[in-house]
From Swiss-Prot:
PANTHER family: E3 UBIQUITIN-PROTEIN LIGASE RNF169, RING-TYPE DOMAIN-CONTAINING PROTEIN. There is a cross-link at residues 267, 343, 492 (Glycyl lysine isopeptide (Lys-Gly) (interchain with G-Cter in SUMO2)). It is an enzyme of class 2 (transferase). Residues 268-277 have a biased composition (Polar residues). GO terms for biological process: DNA damage response; double-strand break repair; negative regulation of double-strand break repair; protein ubiquitination. The keyword Zinc-finger applies. The lineage of its organism: Eukaryota, Metazoa, Chordata, Craniata, Vertebrata. Interacts with DYRK1B. Probable E3 ubiquitin-protein ligase that acts as a regulator of double-strand breaks (DSBs) repair following DNA damage. Functions in a non-canonical fashion to harness RNF168-mediated protein recruitment to DSB-containing chromatin, thereby contributing to regulation of DSB repair pathway utilization. This is E3 ubiquitin-protein ligase RNF169. It comes from Bos taurus. It is found in: Chromosome; Nucleus, Nucleoplasm. One of its GO terms (molecular function) is nucleosome binding.
Length: 689
């Protein structure tokens, strides 16, 4: 608006009556302003219309304190953004509300405000403009603007000092207490769980123990005809209390011979395979009866081991590989203790048997019993289940000889002697010894064999025959036989130097070596050994006689084109044989200082290579034969010995000359430009040169 319109409006208001004062409650409700002091008269700009600057007859109050006449208020409500035309304060909700109303209340309020206003301005309009035409004073006193009212608002307090920290501490304490309670409960649970588990196991075990007799009784009542295998057989109802002895009987178990005699028939009947017919089982029972009688009559400490050899059944497994842990701790001189021990042989027959005989037991028929519970018939009877049996071939019958048969007392003693000798060999072999036993062990072996042979000479000789240590008259000498003769001669040569200590050893050794010659020579030499006196000279003479008889017997047995290639008459003639010309195994292993070739198998080689061992053994043989130093009394033998010595010297000289000749031939000329400068040069390179 222009200033002229303002002046006109002010002039028109002169002479209007002063409005009456408005109650304070109504003013507060309309303006939303807290008034702590008595209300002051409104300013002229507040009472005028904010839009047209005229005092409205019907006015509407805005939230900002300004008022609008009816027309300006309608325009402000219709506008897109209704706001106060003077202070630009937005009041959209107010404008819409006032547009709906009839503006009556606002008009009354504004009328009262106008009546309270300055009389000089309101009087002319109230009077109808009578004084408006009068002259206006030049300077109109205006009321000074009122001071802004002070409104005290209390500050909003979010929290007290330290209240947040206290709240945080309390929350943390609650969390810690909760964790502690959870941990305590978990520990208690962990403590109770093992106890509950142990109590449950204990209850289960007690329940099983209480149920076992009932189950066994029920099984025996419902399944009386249960069958089982011979190896895994369960005891029947009558034998339930007795402990069941397995078929694998350990060697160290000290069961008595009476137990063997009483249970032999039952074991044989149980060990019959399912493929055996009734006739075979009847035959085995017939064979078992006389065998048990023979065993009962021969129940002596010396015949104890042979029971394990002769009274074993075909399908029985009690005769497994021997365990020598007990024999290792026995002294060497306890031959009777070795004989009295019950040590089963590895094979169940006196002949050697391979290892497949024990593995064939895995192919025995297996009895398969059904595991389903038995069915009951409608009348209450129990239906016994079918028993399924597998019937493979009985391989044991074809591969093993039957050994449960009667034998004469002489054969029994002979086999007992074989058994004892095998025990001694296995005990004294260096592969099974835990302590050092040098050559004294060999002498002890020969002395003990001599002592046992004096009591039973015939059995000892038969033992030598059966153990494979002598020559065969039918087939003639072989390489192991020659090995045996050389070892015997060397044994006598070594033992001749110690004839005062062991005077009976050479004679008995010679007796055992004279067996292959013939029955007459054997009996003659045995009589000489038994009737010999105690003088060392007589024993040495008989030793020489034995050597001559042995060599003559060997000459008669050897063929003309023999490897030895000559007539052996003395024990020194063995040195004339060139060991490089002999086949392997003839004199390579027997020229050492072993007394018996059967004990050579378990010994360690003294040298790391065979040629060193052979050379060393030849030297030892010459030294041992030279230590004897006994000149033969027979001139023929003396001449033969000189001849052999000359041949040996000639042979040594020839060997030395041959070595020198070979060394000269191997010497290569290394002169520059020689053809044979490099022996390994190829022909192509030589041609290129």
């Amino acid at each position: 608006m222009s200033g002229r319109a303002k002046v006109a409006g002010e002039e028109a208001l002169v002479g209007v009556a002063a409005p009456q004062p408005v109650p304070a409650g109504i003013l507060d409700e309309c303006t939303n302003v807290t008034v702590s002091q008595p209300p002051s008269p409104p300013r002229p700009e507040e009472s005028d219309c904010a839009g047209c600057l005229e005092t409205p007859g019907e006015a509407a109050a805005l939230p900002c304190g300004h008022s609008l006449c009816r027309g300006c208020a309608q325009r402000a409500a219709d506008a897109a953004g209704p706001c106060c035309p003077r202070c630009r304060a937005r009041g959209a909700g107010w404008a819409r509300r006032r547009a709906r109303d009839d503006w009556q209340a606002d008009a009354e309020v504004l009328g009262e405000r106008a009546r309270r206003g300055p009389p000089e301005r309101c009087r002319p309009r109230r009077d109808g403009g009578a004084a408006a035409a009068g002259p206006r004073p030049e300077q109109e006193s205006r009321a000074a603007p009122a001071e802004p009212e002070f409104i005290f608002r209390a500050p909003i307090k979010l929290s007290k000092p330290g209240e947040f920290r206290e709240e945080y501490e309390s929350l943390r304490k609650l969390r810690e207490e909760k964790l502690q309670e959870e941990k305590t409960s978990e520990d208690q649970i962990h403590k109770l769980l093992p106890e509950d588990t142990e109590i449950g196991k204990r209850k289960m075990d007690e329940q099983k123990k209480r149920d076992e007799p009932v189950v066994l009784k029920t099984n025996l009542e419902h399944c009386p005809a249960r069958l089982s295998d011979s190896e895994n057989e369960e005891p029947s109802r009558g034998k339930m209390i007795q402990t069941h002895r397995s078929a694998f009987v350990s060697k160290s178990s000290s069961y008595s011979l009476a137990f063997l005699a009483g249970n032999l028939n039952s074991k044989m009947e149980r060990s019959q395979s399912c493929s055996d017919t009734g006739q075979d089982r009847a035959k085995s029972r017939l064979r078992a009866a006389p065998t048990s009688k023979a065993k009962a009559t021969a129940m002596t400490p010396t015949s104890n081991p042979i029971i394990g050899v002769l009274l074993s059944t075909r399908n029985h497994r009690c005769l497994s590989a021997p365990d020598l842990t007990v024999e290792k701790r026995l002294p060497f001189s306890s031959l009777s203790a070795l004989a009295s021990l019950h040590k089963p042989e590895r094979s169940i027959s006196p002949e050697s048997n391979d290892s497949i005989s024990e593995e064939l037991n895995h192919f025995k028929p297996i009895v398969c019993s059904p595991c389903t519970p038995p069915k009951r018939l409608p009348d209450g009877r129990v239906l016994s289940p079918l028993i399924i049996k597998s019937t493979p071939r009985n391989l044991n019958r074809s591969l093993q000889k039957q050994t449960s048969y009667e034998a004469s007392p002489r054969i029994l003693k002979k086999w007992e002697q074989i058994f004892q000798e095998r025990q001694i060999k296995k005990t004294l072999s260096k592969a099974t010894l835990t302590s050092l036993a040098p050559e004294t062990g060999d002498d002890l072996l020969v002395s003990e064999v001599t002592q046992s042979n004096k009591e039973k000479p015939l059995l000892a000789l038969n033992t030598r025959l059966s153990s494979g240590q002598v020559l065969s008259e039918c087939t003639g000498p072989t390489a192991p036989d020659l090995d045996y003769f050389s070892s015997v001669s060397q044994t006598k040569a070594e033992q001749g130097s110690d004839r005062k200590k062991n005077t009976e050893i050479p004679l008995e050794t010679c007796c055992s070596s004279e067996l292959p010659v013939g029955a007459s020579g054997t009996s003659l030499e045995r009589e000489q050994s038994e009737r010999s006196g105690s003088s060392p000279d007589a024993k040495l003479d008989k030793t020489r006689i034995t050597a001559s008889m042995k060599i003559s017997a060997v000459n008669s047995v050897l063929p003309k084109n023999s490897v030895l290639g000559g007539v052996l008459k003395t024990k020194k003639q063995l040195k004339t044989v060139n060991h490089f010309d002999l086949p392997n195994g003839v004199l390579a292993d027997n020229l050492g200082d072993e007394p018996l070739p059967s004990l050579r198998r378990g010994r360690k080689r003294r040298c790391k290579t065979k040629h060193l061992e052979q050379n060393g053994s030849l030297k030892k043989l010459r030294q041992s034969s030279g230590e004897v130093g006994l000149a033969p009394t027979d001139p023929v033998l003396r001449e033969m010995e000189q001849k052999l010595q000359q041949e040996e010297e000639d042979r040594q000289l020839a060997l030395q000359l041959q070595r020198m000749f070979d060394n000269e031939r191997r010497t290569v000329s290394r002169r520059k430009g020689s053809v044979d400068q490099y022996l390994l040069r190829s022909s192509s390179m030589a041609g290129a040169k």
